Amino acid sequence: MLATFTIIPIGAGESISPIVAKVVKLVDSSNLDYRLTAMGTIVEGEWDEVLTLIKKAHKLVRRHSARVLTSITIDDRKGAKNRLAGKVDSVKSKLKIEVKS
């Protein structure tokens, strides 16, 4: 499954990149395939491992902020593998333009 998640520490100030960096380090250590985007992180893996990772990330941010907003979008397709790159490649193969990804 794929999951896109965004964790926002409320009241942590204008720049949250130091906290985001800690989350990315946690995600990277999970050994799950992921992509960091400007607005969130996309992770690919099995249900339990992905949700466990997001829970750990939420708790990590919660240690730095009294209030945290976490948004999760899940795409769960039976039998699908390597969708993190595969979904993008599928769209690129149908276009006749260079796509930024």
Could you describe each region identified by the protein language model?
Residues 1-101:
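Charge-rich, low-complexity N-terminal segments
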